[in-house]
Amino acid sequence: MNKKTIVVKFGTSTLTQGSPKLNSPHMMEIVRQIAQLHNDGFRIVIVTSGAIAAGRHYLNHPQLPPTIASKQLLAAVGQSQLIQAWEKLFAIYDIHIGQLLLTRADIEDRERFLNARDTLHALLDNHIIPVINENDAVATAEIKVGDNDNLSALVAILVQAEQLYLLTDQQGLFDSDPRKNSEAKLIPVVEQITDHIRSIAGGSGTNLGTGGMMTKIIAADVATRSGIETIIAPGNRPNVIADLAYEQNIGTKFIAHQSDRLESRKQWLFAAPSAGIITIDNGAQNAILEQNKSLLPAGIINVEGRFSRGEVVKIRTQSGKDIALGMPRYNSDSLQLIKGRKSADIENVLGYEYGAVAMHRDDMIILS
């Protein structure tokens, strides 16, 4: 039975539990839950904060000027400490992890988007848990995703997750500030993110983490518009991750917009104009339109234009009709060499391969 793919985002407050350093006992409990789900067949991806806090503690809380360079220094030192902490804890359960550091450029550039996605799927397919953070040591304002809430939503899209969990130091989203209003009630379900919901989330900001609620609402908006259910839940609740995975009602659930899933994917992948044309034979046309299959090199007759791996191209029939847009796994020069050939010949011809298909069905949109 195929279990769902879940992205779990841990904020610094969840990992430190209010202390100035990573809280190892709490991280151990987190790892125990994820190990249980991993062994039960769930595909888990971790998006982790905490590098700056780990770096500051490792350097014995140095007095540094409040500059971007200082933060990047702490992130550079702390990232290795953070990943080591995760690695040691997962090793107890004989589970391997793989680290990815991402910036916005890795997601917005189509070839890097494909590479990041392929790496994530390769890790998951080999039962390795990806641990992801924004590359704060080198990211500038222009290439930062912005925060790990937003990053986790983009990662959820990358891996086509069913669910995104945003774990925080709050119980979820309340209808007013519970510290100011004793009558404040937890909102268990949000059908749609409206201006009212945004105003609730942005209504207050404190060192307890409520100020970060707006970024979580923005992340939930991005994810749910891509068909990914999102839950804001308390990271310190016992067994919270496992309970969420097995459908217990905890925190605030944001309902996924299933009808928007395809349209958001069109916008995400195919906003740019096409860079070339791949002409296919009748067999490939039938496989794509009637059997919902990927495009194999054997079905390619001609390649027009110069394009890179991951750029958008048109798929055209022998009669001249454009039937699809898609992102090829190979650039135009490589496709010229492998067109009409069997997939088994790819590595012999090119000296490498990105897989047996020229264009995967997941990277293709059929034109009506």
Curated annotation (Swiss-Prot):
Cellular localisation: Cytoplasm
Keyword annotations from UniProtKB, A to Z: Amino-acid biosynthesis, ATP-binding, Cytoplasm, Kinase, Nucleotide-binding, Proline biosynthesis, Transferase
PROSITE patterns given in the database record: GLUTAMATE_5_KINASE (PS00902), PUA (PS50890)
Pathway participation: Amino-acid biosynthesis; L-proline biosynthesis; L-glutamate 5-semialdehyde from L-glutamate: step 1/2
Domain PUA: from-to ranges: 275-353
GO annotation terms (biological process): L-proline biosynthetic process
GO molecular function, one term: RNA binding
Binding residues for ATP: K9, T168, D169, T210, G211, G212, M213, M214, T215, K216
Functional summary from the UniProt entry: Catalyzes the transfer of a phosphate group to glutamate to form L-glutamate 5-phosphate.
NCBIfam families to which the protein is assigned, alphabetical: proB
Family annotation (HAMAP family): ProB
Entry protein name: Glutamate 5-kinase
Source organism (scientific name): Haemophilus influenzae (strain PittGG)
Gene: proB
